[in-house]
Amino acid sequence: MVDREQLVQKARLAEQAERYDDMAAAMKAVTELNEPLSNEERNLLSVAYKNVVGARRSSWRVISSIEQKTSADGNEKKIEMVRAYREKIEKELETVCQDVLSLLDNFLIKNCSETQYESKVFYLKMKGDYYRYLAEVATGEKRATVVESSEKAYSEAHEISKEHMQPTHPIRLGLALNYSVFYYEIQNAPEQACHLAKTAFDDAIAELDTLNEDSYKDSTLIMQLLRDNLTLWTSDQQDDDGGEGNN
């Protein structure tokens, strides 16, 4: 029998050492024990995989940019090598995303009770995020499928959060942040992105007195990110130019 506490301890240790693959493996094993995760365990899982997938997303962007420049040069051998390397990174990224999505579907979302709204929103947001990361690298029909899955998860989380969570709750705010980025970057729908981000920001401002002391820092940081994105996106619309949001 695997000792759950030992696995969690290992994940904490791996985080301090910035060994995120080890951290993710430990938290995957904890999740597969098929018991609900505590808030700390949930966050450890999220941080681990965010860093693991983040490294691949960053590499993919760099190589994609090099690929575009190389295509212009017309050096066939180099073009082929860069393309093969991009595809290798894509496969790694897809494997990580599928790992997370299967943990969410087979254990985490499945095991949420009807009244565990916070956990349900957290995990559905995560589901939306990892389908969004797949959408960043997918093309054609495959892209259409993952975009639809991402939208569905975000939308369900959004409805639950509006009904059961304070507008200042960091998980509700974080969901609005990522959902609006999905609209802007993946759906190419700047008006929807701005509307969602502005509504979330305004609703939180209107209820600042409900800010929980424990989550004050998290909530205000996400509100700042929402505002930064709004500033960027509205200026992009005025310039009629594309831009990138955070997250």
UniProtKB/Swiss-Prot annotation:
GO MF terms held by the record: phosphorylation-dependent protein binding; protein kinase C binding; protein sequestering activity
One annotated GO biological process: protein localization
Site (Interaction with phosphoserine on interacting protein): R57, R132
Gene3D superfamilies assigned: 14-3-3 domain (1.20.190.20)
Cell compartment(s), UniProt: Cytoplasm
CDD domains named in the record: 14-3-3_gamma (cd10024)
Main location: cytoplasm
Keyword line: Cytoplasm
A Pfam family this chain is assigned to: 14-3-3
UniProt entry tagged with the keyword Transmembrane helix: no
Cited function: Adapter protein implicated in the regulation of a large spectrum of both general and specialized signaling pathways. Binds to a large number of partners, usually by recognition of a phosphoserine or phosphothreonine motif. Binding generally results in the modulation of the activity of the binding partner.
Descriptive protein name: 14-3-3 protein gamma-A
Source species of the chain: Xenopus laevis
Gene name of the record: ywhag-a
